[in-house]
């Protein structure tokens, strides 16, 4: 473990929660002046932190603990029948890792995805500045995994390569390709990639029991949740 005790953290003022509208949220951020070190990031991921743009953060709410960090221990992952079908359905896709960058091709796909899948969320309406600030960061451990079919871009999985696993930062995909279940496939592919690289886990961010948009995360078993500062398997 790195010497986390020397790091500084700052808490935001309470603000409206984007997942549970009736709640007020507070977020704990690593000091922005702290260099984005991959080993610090890995240690903080074990403590439930995530990356958004140039910031590492985790929920720090006074009256709510609904946001539970979730990860998949990839060595024990056992795909179910539906997941095997999804993997087989997308075997014709070509996957390529590239350095994060802005392009109109990426933004057009991101824009269609947000407008058709998340028009009720706080990322709507999408903008080029929002896309760049959120996802296009010059970090040596960050990748855009492109999923293409005969050159056509169908999905991008923004992923951080950490010493202890892959952190699934964000995935956006072609909303018209519903049959392919591209969001689910991107997670399955990242699990397989983590296995290939000999890594321990894929970090999925936060799971919220009463948030329907989060339900998909518990379809990957086994899944571990960070509860009382310990990773435990969800039964």
From Swiss-Prot:
GO terms for molecular function: arginyl-tRNA--protein transferase activity; leucyl-tRNA--protein transferase activity. It holds the Pfam family ATE_C. Keywords: Acyltransferase, Cytoplasm, Transferase. Gene3D superfamilies: 3.40.630.30. One of its GO terms (cellular component) is cytoplasm. Its EC number is 2.3.2.29. It catalyses: N-terminal L-glutamyl-[protein] + L-leucyl-tRNA(Leu) = N-terminal L-leucyl-L-glutamyl-[protein] + tRNA(Leu) + H(+); N-terminal L-aspartyl-[protein] + L-leucyl-tRNA(Leu) = N-terminal L-leucyl-L-aspartyl-[protein] + tRNA(Leu) + H(+). GO terms for biological process: ubiquitin-dependent protein catabolic process via the N-end rule pathway. It is found in: Cytoplasm. InterPro entries: Acyl_CoA_acyltransferase (IPR016181), Asp_Glu_LeuTrfase (IPR017138), N-end_Aminoacyl_Trfase (IPR030700), N-end_Aminoacyl_Trfase_C (IPR007472), N-end_Aminoacyl_Trfase_N (IPR007471). It comes from the Bacteria. HAMAP family: Bpt. Functions in the N-end rule pathway of protein degradation where it conjugates Leu from its aminoacyl-tRNA to the N-termini of proteins containing an N-terminal aspartate or glutamate. Belongs to the R-transferase family. Bpt subfamily. This is Aspartate/glutamate leucyltransferase. It comes from Pseudomonas fluorescens (strain Pf0-1). The lineage of its organism: Bacteria, Pseudomonadati, Pseudomonadota, Gammaproteobacteria, Pseudomonadales. The gene is bpt.
């Amino acid at each position: 473990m790195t010497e986390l005790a020397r790091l500084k953290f700052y808490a935001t003022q309470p603000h409206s929660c984007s997942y549970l509208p009736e709640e007020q949220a507070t977020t704990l951020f690593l000091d922005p002046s702290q260099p984005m070190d991959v080993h610090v990031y890995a240690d903080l991921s074990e403590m439930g932190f995530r990356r958004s743009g140039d910031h590492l953060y985790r929920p720090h709410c006074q009256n709510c603990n609904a946001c539970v960090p979730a990860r998949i221990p990839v060595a024990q992952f056992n795909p179910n029948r539906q997941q095997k079908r999804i993997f087989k359905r997308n075997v014709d896709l070509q996957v390529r890792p590239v350095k994060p960058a802005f392009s109109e091709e990426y933004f057009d796909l991101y824009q269609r995805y947000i407008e058709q899948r998340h028009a009720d969320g706080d990322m709507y309406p999408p903008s080029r500045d929002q896309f760049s600030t959120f996802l296009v960061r010059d970090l040596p451990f960050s990748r855009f995994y492109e999923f293409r079919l005969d050159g056509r871009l169908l999905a991008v999985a923004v992923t951080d390569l950490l010493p202890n696993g892959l952190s699934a930062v964000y995935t956006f995909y072609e909303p018209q390709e519903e049959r392919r279940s591209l969001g689910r496939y991107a997670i399955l592919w990242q699990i397989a990639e983590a296995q290939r690289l000999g890594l321990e886990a894929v970090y999925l961010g936060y799971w919220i029991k009463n948030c329907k948009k989060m339900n998909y995360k518990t379809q990957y078993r086994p899944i571990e949740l960070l509860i009382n500062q310990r990773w435990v398997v969800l039964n």
